[in-house]
From Swiss-Prot:
IV repeats lie at residues 1232-1530. Not tissue specific but widely expressed. The lineage of its organism: Eukaryota, Metazoa, Chordata, Craniata, Vertebrata. The gene is Scn7a. Residues 1-117, 168-178, 220-237, 408-505, 560-568, 609-625, 732-933, 990-997, 1040-1054, 1202-1249, 1305-1311, 1362-1376, 1504-1680 are cytoplasmic. The keyword Cytoplasm does not apply. This is Sodium channel protein type 7 subunit alpha. GO terms for cellular component: glial cell projection; plasma membrane. It comes from Rattus norvegicus. It is a multi-pass membrane protein.
Amino acid sequence: MLTSPEPKGLVPFTAESLELIKNHIAKKCNEEHEEEDLKPSWGLEAGKKLPFAYGTLPQGTVSEPLEDVDPYYYVKRNTFMVLNRNRVIFRFNAVSILCTLSPLSSLRRAVIKVLVHPLFRLLILISVLTDSILMCMSNLPEWILAVENTLLGIYTFEILVKVIARGIWAGSFSFLGDLWNWLDFSVTLFELITRSSPLSSLPMFKTIRTLRILKIIPLNHGLQSIVVTLVQCLKKLLGAIALALFFLTVSSLFGMGLFMGNLKHKCVRWPQEDGNDVMYNGTGSQYHILERENFYYMEGARYALLCGNKTDAGLCPEGYMCVKEGSNPDNGFTSFDNFGWALLAMFRLMTQDYPELLYHQILYASGKIYMIFFVLISFWFAFYMASLFLGILTMAYEQEKQRASEESRDMDSKCHQTVKEFEEEHEGAEMETTQIEMKKRSPTSINTTLDILEDTALGHKEEPETSRKECPLCWYKFTKTCFIWKCSPCWIKLNEFADRIITHPLFDLFLVICIILNICFLALEHFPMSEELMSLLAIGNLVFIGIYTIEMILKIIAMHPYGYFQISWHIFDSILVVLGLTEMLLADIEEITVFILVPLIFIKLGKYAPPFKNLMRILGRALVALKDLVLLVSIFIYFSAVFGMKLFGRSYKDCVCHVDQDCQRQRWHMSDFLHAYVTVFRILCGEWIETLWECMEVAGEAWCIPFYMMVILIGNLLILYLFVALVSSFASYDATTEVSKEAKNLQLAVAWIKMVINCVLLKILCKEKTVSTEATDQTCDPSVKENISGHTLSELSNTQTFLRYKDQSSGTEKTPVTESESQSLIASPSVSETVPIASGESDIENLDNKETRSKSANGSSKEKMKQSSSSECSTVDIAISEEEEMVYEHEKSKLHKNGYERKSSAGQVSRESRNGKIWRNIRKTCCKIVENSWFECFIGLVTLLCTGTLALEDIYIDQRKTIKIFLEYGDMIFAYIFILEMLLKWVAYGFKAYFSNNWYKLDFMVVIVLCLSLIGKTREDLNPLASIKFLRALRVLSQFERMKVVLRALIKTTLPAVSVFLVCLMIWLLFSVMGVFLFAGKFYECIDPTRGERFSVFEVMNKSQCENLVFNESMPWENAKLNFDNVGNGFLSLFQVATFNGWISIMNSAIDSVGVYMQPSFEHSLHMYTYFIIFVVFGLFLPLCMLIGVIIRNFNKQKIKQGGSNIFITVKQKKQYRALKKLLYADSQKPAARPRNKFQGFICDVVTHRVFNVIIILLICFQATTIMIQNDEQSPQIETAVFWMNSLFTMLFTLECILKLTAFRCHYFTSAWNVHDFMVVVFSITGLLLPLSIGQYFVPPSLVQLLLLSRIIHVLRPGKGPKVFHDLMLPLMLSLPALLNIALLIFLVMFIYAIFGMYNFAYVKKEAGINDVSNFETFGSSMLCLFQVTTFSGWDGMLDAIFNSQWSDCDPDKINPGTQVRGDCGSPSVGIFYFVSYILISWLIIVNMYVVLIMEFLSIPSKRKNRTLSEDDFRRFFKVWNRFDPDRTQYIDSTKLSDFAAALDPPLFMAKPNKGQLVAMDLPMAAGDRIHCLDILLAFTKRVMGKDERVEKILSEIESGFMLANPFKITYEPITTTLKRKQEAVSATIIQRAYKSYRLRQSDKKIQDIPEIDDGREDPNSKGVHSGQIEEKASIQTQI
């Protein structure tokens, strides 16, 4: 049995089995076994169910010890298994427990039966769930203590059962061999110790108990598997985590050097006395500065205004001075004063949580120039790290999915093999008794046997019919009697009539129209609403419910109740009708309409929308497959909420005054479970810094920061993995899948209506013509074809008119298509169908002129194209690669040059006339001009100048008269130049060619814009025309190839996702309608005009009381700017919730809402948190996965069409990309030649040694450490020490520079790294010497530190730093060309929107998000605003300021100094369009940036796997070979082969143990067990590159090259191979073992034949013989 590779059947575990295991252990200790390839079976893991291929469980095998069916555990791990009645596998160690209980012990068997019983696990699960529920409750009654003691007893009993059944530590399946048991034992032991101790009331000890919630994970095998998978992903993320920590550390150190102490600068009211006060530090009187009231505060601000002493920093108002005093903002938690706070600030920037506040604080205190620092951190660091983590998780998920599919496939093959062997075993016996059995068997017995075989083969696959057959016969009679109605002929006729109605296409069309109208009626709900509209909507609701009821009745009549309820959509419709009727009866219950009925109406529309059904089907399958992961995420959120509540709940109650001056509890706390759950949910949504500040105020940094980091890191890992899994599922979305019957009927109905309209129009047109009937038919037929070309074949295949016109046009006999044939044509995706493309529609996928290309081809190619590719005949497009389109861009001049003559009919007629020759020469001249490269460069330069001048037209333009005049003349010059260019191209190419090119159309539009802007300047009433000049920046798109490529790729990847976007829009419409039903008119509140705060509900209850207040003068009953009063406002509010900007204020208004015209009350409707949580999950997360998945699918499709190349780079960049890839994949650079001078050679050896590089890296790290230990309030002694440390490091780096200059000479400056080091040394020396002469004010001490710190990038240097860093940076470097192209496009978008913002929002009142730093007054400030919006942060505050359009909020007549513009009001509609459109466009571009980098990361393993070996690889191979073959014999001994393979460098490297792999290579061996160099090289090369024709060609080239390099190769004849030699060795071992066993048995026989001596004397001879035989036996045993 031990030699069997696959134990078959279920064998009881007996004493013989235990003896075999012991013998096997003894043999393993004395022998060397080759079991390296033995691996555990995926389908036989502990916790999984036994495959059904093993048959049904025989009696006596349930809950009894069995021999393990997995050879890996049976042979290697010495285990036995137990199956419970649910076939779940349990494994135990086949060793004695506590030295007394063997596997055959009755006590242990009884305990094992208890452990494996399903009820025992159910008991533990119920206990854990009960305990988890009790943990989240507050103010528990006293009797709960008895329940907790009972649960503790159950946990203790469970531990005892596991210890007795499994043992404590012996074996891999012992109690302590499972880490989950460690957790369970620790928590239980701790709880037993502290149960009666007074320490149990402390929060820390209560927190430990919450770990019990995690016990749910080991109770579910799926959850346990997900945790193991996530741990494996975490191991793969270690390199990325190390790189992220490196970037965080470096950026924090730079932040310390740039901003240390700057955030303490505040505006202080300067005393007006004569200066008699005692001065403190030369900046002001000490007592005056320390007074908080003397700081300057903005209106409504909590912290003092920050300022700076630099030119572009924030300025103080008149009467105030900027002084460094006080604490840092945000209660001192936001600063760069030491490394810890700087690290927290950088982590906040990396996660993009409330970054706009940190931007403003730094820019106010240090200057706007430092925005560059934040751009680099946010755009590159945060973007790259997010892409890196997503890429690694995606790769891990794909590998796990591939592994699971392979193991499942292997398991299925094993199951089928087992079934086949089972059938073969029984086939012989059945053949012998065939005649007898056939006579005895009855049909029932035959069916039973077949059912058994089918069950054995299929296992868990049960057919529905089988389950229905198991029902009693009475149920079938009852169903046939009550649910299948065939009463009378009249009823049958009624049945047929109803069937004709519901199957008619117009019926489905009518239903779709009714559903759309119903949704429109729901969307018309708003506040306030007139009585007439309310009654109309109520009547409409009743009508639609009646229509749905009639539909259900007709379908029940037509299909019978039995057939009706067999379809899931019909069950859904019946639920909708029942709920609608219930709503009519219970009109007071509003929740039925909002939460149930409204979503069902929207889902009902999805039945007729194939994209919606396909997406929902994919979503359903994905969620079923990922149910364990979703459950794990839910458990983690629950655990984190309970953990936080237990840890910080008391602190939030006791220290509430630390957060609020009035000692009122804040909204976001963890005092109870609901608030803790919502707080954790907010943290996982990316907003954690504000709640962290409050937590640190009440509980301290030591507890809050670790807890928040745990929630952020683990929670984001789970969510990102779930996100990757869902995106991978939606990446398989195909819009061309089979459509439903309802959708087909809808298409047929629409086609029928179109055809009727066309026929009516056709008759009207034909009557007006006075021609014969035949001529009329001939003229009408083409139009009919054109009209029919817009429909699908399925829409018209049943119509006789279509067949008649088709017969007339083709002249052949046609056969009408039946309904079944038509539907089969539709359902088959492989059959050619007509694509519904409108007549004359332009090809949107290609912005170039494809029509010109087709016309320039010869006539034969045209005919082929007509016959082979027509959009009306096939859905398969002829793919034109991106490179061909780009080549066309370069060759378009030839096409225009060769084709312009053919496009002019007049020119063709009078070509030889004098005017014709002049016209032709003029066109040739114009063509040469516009195709000249200098002309193109000139136009490109003018385009850049024309675009760049837009940035100068800010609010200060009226004060700069010269620049204003210059711009006015410049606009005219640009207009003339572009008009001249347009005229030249008209003459050169002709109107048709010009307007057939979309880029030329864009140029023409820009010319129109320029002309309109010039006209708008001439008259004041046309001033709005002058503001559209920002559109002329769009001309940049047509002038630069990189932007063309990116825009073309974006269109190709985005347009196919329009249907998915519409589905997402419908989901948002659903939530908006629900929001209107829930919150319309409830966000109004009564505001105290004096304080600007809301009145308490005890002072004002409703609107009438608010208006009756005596001091009410300005109508304080105000509505929130963001509300749900109508669907449009609901969309905007949901958009802010989706971007997590301003969503807190929206949620606060919803949570405080009481009713219409009622004053809001603090947290009156806490259950409304549910609405926003559901929206974030189902309205944001899942639609986001859908969109990104479809975009990735389109990206991959376009990439495949282009042969696997990147679609965001040009043809020229693709060549550069290949060169860059070769350069980056090269493992080492060619070193400089070693100097011949001995001294220089010695120095060269020193500086090129790896130890020297390690020393330099350590010095850089030590220098970084000196910055970490600094802080803002350090003593002068520390500053002096830091100065001398900087001097020391400068000297050491200078010495390094001198040594390398001596060693490398002029070659030193050929490396960019060396040039950087040299510049750092020069500037560091200058930075140390300049303060001695000009003072430290101009050269800050941190400058030298930052210069020296810049050398830390050597850690990322290939070959110098960690290899894992180089591997992780490689995708970024390879995708850099594409990323730069996309960045150019997003910069152009930012530029256009910045100009638009300057024209529309430059004078908006400064409040909320618009201030002295973030505004639209200048181009730079506008770009800063748009940078914030690009990162989806801060745009809600800007929009809030733009919403000020009423007299109460702004002054429309305000005089703005220096300009003629009046007022500071905004335009809400323009602001909404501005921000929403920009966010969508920038999001789309940024998503493609993520996709580019992630796809590049995923492609690197395949590129490395498929790449050929380079010359460096072979050079290193022979370098290692020379160490093992110093005599150049071209041979090595076979015993050295393993060491040689382990000494090679990757990719030829083979780690030990590698003997099995080397033997499998079957290498030829010569006499003396030697192996030739060429054989080893060819075998290793084949292992790396695989086996195909390309590899065989490369191997032949390697062999021929080796023969040329070694012409005197020693000839030899291989006598054997490594595989044969191993087989011989194994055979010899077996023979030797058998001989030794024979010798041992003979020796035992001789010993037994020696007679015993009865007397007490001993014969010395016999004693010697006996002892010699014993020694001989012992020696034989030793040899064995």
